[in-house]
Amino acid sequence: SVGFKAGVKDYKLTYYTPDYETKDTDILAAFRVTPQPGVPPEEAGAAVAAESSTGTWTTVWTDGLTSLDRYKGRCYHIEPVAGEENQYIAYVAYPLDLFEEGSVTNMFTSIVGNVFGFKALRALRLEDLRIPTSYTKTFQGPPHGIQVERDKLNKYGRPLLGCTIKPKLGLSAKNYGRAVYECLRGGLDFTKDDENVNSQPFMRWRDRFLFCAEAIFKAQAETGEIKGHYLNATAGTCEEMMKRAVFARELGVPIVMHDYLTGGFTANTSLSHYCRDNGLLLHIHRAMHAVIDRQKNHGMHFRVLAKALRLSGGDHIHAGTVVGKLEGEREITLGFVDLLRDDFIEKDRSRGIYFTQDWVSLPGVLPVASGGIHVWHMPALTEIFGDDSVLQFGGGTLGHPWGNAPGAVANRVALEACVQARNEGRDLAREGNEIIREASKWSPELAAACEVWKE
């Protein structure tokens, strides 16, 4: 007789193990599963566990050459989603040995690489991951982290202010540098390359880097504050990206930028290592995230992409605003903002956090609020995001009727007023508009901004 039983068998016989005790070293995943009609949730959950670990669609003789029990993913719990028809949360545990150390790329290839096109599922969404300490320790994480960044910049006790230079495409390098200088001189801490500014015919990267560096040093000399501009090093190849980062370091600027989803995790991790070794801060933009995270029942939640970035490395990352033009629910956003900044985060389903996550002193990432925000939003932003954040006003700076520098002044005055009011114990949520109005009495720049963007 044959040594094994050939043929197709139900996944749930092998991969659905409700009595499994999860190990501290397991990577745990919470999937939102929508099975096809007639497929039981246990089979759907088990199929996810199988296809993203050791399973294939039929029994194979080489299964006998390994210990499936040691290497298989296990679906250990399934619960229906309240208020949704035919949606379940399937919890899957993966043994640590399935993953290459220090590779976000491999982690994602394993967990979400293949299983999302699966026939038995109508839709599938990865809601959260628990990264065990033993795996976290194989990553360097952010190049510097929040505390080191504050010490480098000598800025404490308030959020940092940024501004994306617009029009994002079409300016010459010299005019671009001019816009940067005006914003920094007016009182912003940072200006930013737009995510699609790489090296186009109207402005090559080297020219932009040179003029922006000049703008930074001039503004620093005039204001006595440390300034930065996120120089976008994203490129078509990793080698070209590194070349740009090296040039930025040679110019002596403090920070570079990368589009981590379009650039890819492998490129991002390389850049992150370079930044730590060479004292550059790394600003991360999440272009393409909505392609992955916008659908409620399919894809990946942004909190997973945020966790992955903290492992791969970045000092700032865009995290939505809770106010402005891009969507984001408050509690859920605050959930992944804390996942980025804090060392230890308790499981809390009301904030979308499915697992308790211990980052074991991996440096934190500053969340960046950006997109359609202006001076009237300042009290809300200060209250919601707190000190450890970057508030970015693109149009909210450059749209000022008097120009960039007064626009920057308006934002800085509004921020300092909010921070002062908060430190005096005033309630920003209730008195926010009043605080801004008071401040605008002694700042004509702020008064003009208040006129343009009505509360």
UniProtKB/Swiss-Prot annotation:
It holds the Pfam family RuBisCO_large_N. It is found in: Plastid, Chloroplast. One of its GO terms (cellular component) is chloroplast. Mg(2+) binds at residues 192, 194-195. One of its GO terms (molecular function) is magnesium ion binding. RuBisCO catalyzes two reactions: the carboxylation of D-ribulose 1,5-bisphosphate, the primary event in carbon dioxide fixation, as well as the oxidative fragmentation of the pentose substrate in the photorespiration process. Both reactions occur simultaneously and in competition at the same active site. Belongs to the RuBisCO large chain family. Type I subfamily. The basic functional RuBisCO is composed of a large chain homodimer in a 'head-to-tail' conformation. In form I RuBisCO this homodimer is arranged in a barrel-like tetramer with the small subunits forming a tetrameric 'cap' on each end of the 'barrel'. This is Ribulose bisphosphate carboxylase large chain. It comes from Senna didymobotrya. The gene is rbcL.
